[in-house]
A protein has these predicted regions:
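ATP-binding/phosphotransfer module of carbohydrate and carboxylate kinases, centering on a glycine-rich
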Residues: 2-45, 51, 56-122, 186, ...
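Short, acidic, Ser/Thr-enriched surface-loop or helix-capping motifs
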Residues: 80, 137, 207
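Short, active-site-adjacent cap segments at secondary-structure transitions
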Residues: 134-137, 175-178, 203-204, 213, ...
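Short secondary-structure boundary segments
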Residues: 131, 172, 198-200, 249, ...
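Short glycine-aspartate micro-motif
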Residues: 54, 64-68, 124-128, 193-197, ...
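Glycine-rich phosphate-binding loop of actin/hexokinase-like ATP-binding domains
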Residues: 190-246
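General beta-strand structural signal in soluble alpha/beta enzymes
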Residues: 42, 168-172, 206
Length: 374
């Protein structure tokens, strides 16, 4: 019952019976016992038209934290066991940031945030971290050289855990963005979904039945390094003509002369919103390139839903409509139709929420947690 609530969030007792395979009577007895122990909290709902008992983990079970190191920003959030955010902050990151300095900073910020809630860092049950690169689940390190130079060769989870004395878990930003959407938002009803993250880099997270598909070395979903032109420019991964060289933020900004002041992705988005035709065209062309790569991904994995997130997703249909058209032209036809392409629900906080979800997945409500509730 506890594992099902960690995975799905709030559920009615009937939904709990369905997700666990237990009888309604057994679920009712377990809920009563765990509610009395302070592990669960119950309330009433009529969301299905009938009055029902809604069950969730009790907030006092403890706190978990999520952190997302993107290319330019660090997002941090602390949530209770119901995934309700109780503190959050965003700080800028310098280009080419390195693990040592940034993990030191994250340690200080986590301590300050927990103290502002009247606690201490030891109150955190677990911490999840999202990084802008694939992570090898066997080693905990960046799996591909060149994608995140300042973080290579480091077991980030182990390094941060040594600083804060709490369990830490690490995955890629695309995986965790996809996990958040699949568990809590747009992809919740889908049996399989792909979260395509488009910003300073391009990558994808594949989710099947609510669980991530990572591959042997964590490189699943690296569509930013699908070859678009084998004679194209050299990519940071050392290959030529990768999708990122045509559709990621650095490539898009490089299309404008310095005199136009397109220094950041926010400049491009603002220009597009203001109706600047060249900005609109650049984003639309990026969407077309990405859509062609997504079509290949669909031919390989046949997902039910495509969810688009990341910084460039703020362009909305200017980006997504060309993706949709490219998918229709390039993907194999299916009797049930092609997967729907939709915008992500969580915006800039999706990857952080996914990190929180991953952290909560690893929390065991055992004797130690029960002792906190006594």
């Amino acid at each position: 019952v506890v594992e099902s609530l960690k995975r799905h969030g709030r559920l009615t007792q009937i939904e709990l019976a369905g997700s666990t395979g237990l009888s309604p009577a057994t679920v009712s007895n377990i809920v009563k016992e765990l509610t009395a122990a302070g592990v669960l909290h119950t309330s009433f709902t009529s969301r299905s038209g009938r009055r029902a008992t809604l069950v969730a983990l009790a907030r006092r079970v403890g706190l978990v934290a999520g952190a997302h190191f993107s290319t330019r920003q660090l997002h941090i959030a602390i949530a209770d066991a119901t995934r309700t955010t109780v503190a959050e902050t965003v700080v800028p990151l310098a280009p080419g940031h390195r693990h040592d300095a940034e993990l030191d900073r994250l340690t200080l910020l986590l301590g300050d945030m927990v103290e502002s809630l009247g606690g201490q860092i030891s109150d955190l049950l677990a911490v999840g971290v999202a990084l802008p690169a694939p992570i090898d689940p066997r080693t905990g390190m960046v799996s591909t050289p060149g994608l995140l130079p300042g973080w290579e060769g480091v077991d980030v989870a182990e390094s941060l855990s040594a600083r804060i004395g709490r369990p830490v878990f690490v995955d890629s930003e695309a995986n965790l963005g996809g996990l958040a959407e699949a568990r809590e938002a747009t992809g919740r009803g889908a049996t399989s979904s792909v979260f395509v993250r488009v910003g300073h880099t391009i990558s994808a997270g594949l989710v099947v039945d609510g669980d991530l598909f990572r591959g042997v070395s964590g490189k699943t979903g690296q569509i930013g390094h699908v070859t678009i032109d084998e004679n194209g420019p050299v990519c940071r991964c050392s290959n030529r003509g990768c999708l990122e060289m045509y559709a990621a933020a650095p490539a898009l900004l490089a299309l404008f002369p310095e005199s136009e002041g397109m220094q950041r992705l926010t400049d491009l988005l603002a220009a597009s919103d203001a109706g600047v035709s060249t900005a609109h065209r650049v984003i639309a062309d990026a969407g077309r390139h990405i859509g062609i790569a997504v079509a290949s991904l669909c031919n390989l994995f046949d997902p039910e839903l495509i969810i688009v997130g990341g910084e460039l997703a703020q362009a909305g249909e200017i980006l997504i409509a060309p993706m949709r058209h490219a998918l229709e032209r390039s993907a194999l036809a299916a009797t049930g139709g092609l997967p729907e392409i939709v915008a992500a629900s969580f915006g800039e906080w999706g990857e952080t929420r996914g990190a929180i979800t991953m952290a909560l997945d690893h929390v065991s409500v055992d004797a130690d947690v029960a002792a906190r509730l006594a």
